[in-house]
């Protein structure tokens, strides 16, 4: 609970347009999750009842409440680190890149996040750009950059052609 709705819903929408299998995950014991501004989403699965062995991507939306909860979830942090160490993809936007910084995932990488969180990107060079993609990690600055961030995820998973097709569908400039 406490996720940034624009970031979460934009990512969900764009990935589904690209026909990427996506599971919305509740970190709590109920499938209903409430965002920072009172918008409720229905999660597909509960984190505590799901195995992540076959997942290609961990995507962390921002939001002050959800990021605080994620910081305190040692099981999730272990799963994220294991996922990263296996060469699978990790994406974080807004406040949540700070979690990647804490885990050492951003070491010697360019990264971005909300400007107020730039000092939490341990080991990274903060760029302040809308998105940064390095190796198997993508970071996003914040809600206003959610479309670019989601298109970046599509490009990583499905390639530039699919990302361009989704961008054109949304009347985004492709270049």
Over which residues does each language-model region extend?
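N-terminal beta1-alpha1 ligand-phosphate binding loop
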Residues: 1-10, 14
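Active-site-adjacent pocket-lining segments in enzyme domains
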Residues: 3, 17-26, 44-46, 50-175
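N-terminal beta-loop-helix "entrance" segment that forms/cooperates
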Residues: 25-45
């Amino acid at each position: 609970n406490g996720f940034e709705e624009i970031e979460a819903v934009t990512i969900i929408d764009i990935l589904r347009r690209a026909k990427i299998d996506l599971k919305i995950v509740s970190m709590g014991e109920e499938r209903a999750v409430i965002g920072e501004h009172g918008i409720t989403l229905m999660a597909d699965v509960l984190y505590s009842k799901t195995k992540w062995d076959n997942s290609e991507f961990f995507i962390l939306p921002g939001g002050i409440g959800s990021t605080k909860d994620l910081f305190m979830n040692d099981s999730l942090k272990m799963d994220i680190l294991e996922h990263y160490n296996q060469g699978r993809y990790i994406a974080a936007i807004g406040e949540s890149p700070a979690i990647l910084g804490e885990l050492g995932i951003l070491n010697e990488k360019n990264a971005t996040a909300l400007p107020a969180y730039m000092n939490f990107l341990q080991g990274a060079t903060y760029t302040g750009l809308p998105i940064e993609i390095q190796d198997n990690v993508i970071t996003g600055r914040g809600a206003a950059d959610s479309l670019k961030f989601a298109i970046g995820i599509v490009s990583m998973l499905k390639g530039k052609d699919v990302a361009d097709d989704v961008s054109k569908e949304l009347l985004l400039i492709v270049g």
